[in-house]
Structures are given as C-alpha cells and as structure tokens.
Amino acid sequence: MIKSPKFTHSKKDNNKAQGRSAHLTAIVVSLVLSIIMITISVFNVSAVVIDVSSHDGLIDWNRIEEHVEGVIIRIGYGNDIEGQDDKQAIRNMNECERLGIPYGVYIYSYALTSDEVTSEINHTLRMLQGRSPVRGVWFDMEDADGYKESNGLDVYKDGELLTDFCIQFIEAMDKEGYKTGVYA
C-alpha cells in the first residue's frame, strides 16, 4: 500500500486557527482576486477564474457567483485514500453546478513513483464520479511543502521523471475524455 503524508492538528491548534481563519481567509481571497485582476489587465485575459480548496473554508458561493467566471477546485492530494480527499470538494463542485459556475478540478500530487501517479489518477477519477468539469482536470505538480525534494526528487535533476509523471496523468485523463493540463 502506498502511503502519503498525513497532516494532523490538535484541537487546541484548531481552536486558535478558527479565531484567525475568517480574517486570514478574507485577506487571502482579496490577494488572490487582486493577483487575478492584475493578471487579467496585463495579459488581457477574458475570464476571472479562482482556485479554491478546504483551506478557504465554507465558501458562500451565492456571494462569489457574480464575481467569477470560473473556479478550479482542489479535489484532494496524494494517493487514492479518502482521508486525502479535499473536505470541501464535493460541496464546492455541487455548488458550482447548482449556480452554473464553470469549474475545473485539480489534485495536488505527492507522487514519487509511477505507481503513486496511478493512485492519484484513481483518486481523481473517484472524486469526479462521472462529472464533466468544463475548465478541465489539472495535475498540480508544485512542491510547495518540500515533500518531493525531502524525499529525493529534485525538480532540476529529475525533470524527465516529473515530465513522465505529467504525461502519465494527462494520457489517463484524456483516455477518460477529460480536458487535462499541468498546474504548477
């Protein structure tokens, strides 16, 4: 069985975080929207699309609906284990469908091997369960927390291997009929 890292927090940590969560979420959402708006004006992009995950908490989609033209929703991270599903993914997809907001999805990859990519492919397909996200299915290859590097993958030296992982994911999603890309 392939295992991915587990992240846990104590109840005390969660209580502290809750007090700051709403304020920090508002700041982060404002910054993200500002960056998106700057990108739009610089590159003449015609759509405002935001990235959301359980880190954004319980989103009031009725308020966001009029400000976005699309959403990219994190559906999970790592291997095909329910504990690594994004806790808000199903709700976020349902809300976008209810309100007619075009959305795509992404999985944050922790893959170190081809077998782990296969597990992440299965994770993605399980979470989609027949949905058809019009903004595509994305393979997030960032290493924001340093997991890949701390486990021996170097983005500069192992570029060919990481490219193979991306190709493996894209080919599997294409075979299932999804528009697919790499989110990095």
Give residue ranges: language-model regions.
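Substrate-binding cleft of extracellular glycoside hydrolase catalytic domains
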Residues: 48-176
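Conserved acidic, small-residue-rich alpha-beta core segments centered on
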Residues: 169, 181-184
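Gram-positive cell-envelope targeting signals
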Residues: 1-47
